[in-house]
Amino acid sequence: MLTQVDGLKEKGFWDTLANRLYYALFHAVSAMLICDGREVGSHKGAAIRFHQFYVKTGLFTIEEGSFYSQMETLREKADYNCYFDVTEAEILERIAPTLQLIEKIEQYISDKGY
């Protein structure tokens, strides 16, 4: 999914880019939950568990938890709201934080020995 970022930026496919960034983040969060023996049944469930087990315990910041929730909302609007288009500015400012959060999750998983 992340291999598509540059191509989608070049083409100006902001809605699709929001989708890909969110799903990359969702899959990272899901992998972390699974590695810790927690079930992932839905997008909302993953978000709730991320906040419950990682944000509230201080492993991830409140800002990171909020960012994850914002990315889910942005993706839902981009995918399902016919009257909403993600702007270039909205998505470009979210690329680096998404990649940073994924890297932090990958490090957490790696530190656990997976």
PLM regions and their residue ranges:
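Terminal alpha-helical segments
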Residues: 1-114
